Amino acid sequence: MQGKYKVITLCGSTRFKEEFLSVQKQLTLDGNIVISVGLFGHSGDNEIWENMDEGTLTRTKEMLDDMHKAKIDMADEIFVINVGGYIGDSTRSEIQYAKMHGKKVNYLE
């Protein structure tokens, strides 16, 4: 909690950009502080990814994964964007991390 506001970190495949944005808006209007992804690797931000060499791309993805775990640490709970029930390996690992750290886990579907 930050004051009277619950902090929620969004997790899920970045292919679901529209759902991330929609859920972020709704949770914010519901009175929560929402932490989301910084980049959409699977559904946007191509200008970032297209000019990276393989080594830089790998290091950047590792950094973003590590940063997302830090975002989970800051949150009271996570909200999983699992459109059609889809949960990929990265999201599965974030859910496991959140549970190991005593965070509540909620799901879109």
Label each region the model flagged.
Residues 1-109:
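Conserved catalytic or regulatory cores that recognize and/or transform ribose-phosphate-containing ligands
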